[in-house]
Amino acid sequence: PLQGKTLDTEEEAIEQIAEWNEVKTFTPVIEENALCIYKDRQRPVLVKGVPDNYTELSHIQDIVTSGTFQLNDGRIDYVSLGIGVAGQLGVVANSPYPVELYAPNRLGKVNLANPSQSFNGRRIFVSSTFCANQAIYDDQLAIIPLSTAREMFSYTTEATAIELRLTPTTNENEFAKKLREHLGDAYRVATHMQQNDWYKWVQIEKWITFLILSFILMIATFNVIGALSMLIVDKKRDIDTLQNLGA
């Protein structure tokens, strides 16, 4: 959408697109920035929540470098990381240790007294890594199930974008024109090439989010240190009192 970050996937004009003959795959996605932590390393990532039919849209399984691309095995959710993200975190596919994803609480305010309540977190295991040979994907993307992304970012039926795979005989530019006429001025329609330019702006937003999250985590650390310091002082007073009493 041109205004705001999300669209409602249950809106009639959106649902109609899935029925068009030119559309082979209709895929709602959520893209939001988050902080990814693995052991003592951390970096900002672009979390992309996708539905089960994502492999029909992207054929991402063809660019997997390690592990097997899967986002859910019926019991556990998984994440697939760009090879650059995985390398900087030092994590490999099928690691017994999960990565942690943290994002600001979209519906709440920053709570400086208890910063942990200011963001949502998820622990999730890495099923695979992929290499698209494009830095905008390899160095920032973390793909998770759409349902998990909606929980993490407090969405229900919303999506930040709808990605489409067209039939082989469909002209991309002509279809984009038809789509703009159908949706009107309320939505942004972009071809694959135009989408790459948009990702450059996402990179800037990603680092801003990283700085904000780092600041919140730093405050949380200082709060813990302060609380421990006060506890030590109180305990020392108790020890001194007991010693004075001859204990």
Annotated model-derived regions:
Residues P1-L46, D52, E56, D62-R75:
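Hydrophobic, regular-secondary-structure patches
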Residues A18-K24, L89, Y187, K206:
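Structural motif
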Residues T55, V85-A86, A149:
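A generic structural signal for short hydrophobic patches within well-formed alpha-helices
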Residues D77-Y78, L141:
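A residue-level structural signature of the nucleotidyltransferase/glycosyltransferase Rossmann-like core
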Residues L81-P96:
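Short, solvent-exposed hinge/capping segments at secondary-structure junctions
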Residues N94-A186:
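Basic-flanked hydrophobic alpha-helices used for secretion and membrane insertion
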Residues Q134, P168-I225, L231-D234:
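Peri-transmembrane interface segments
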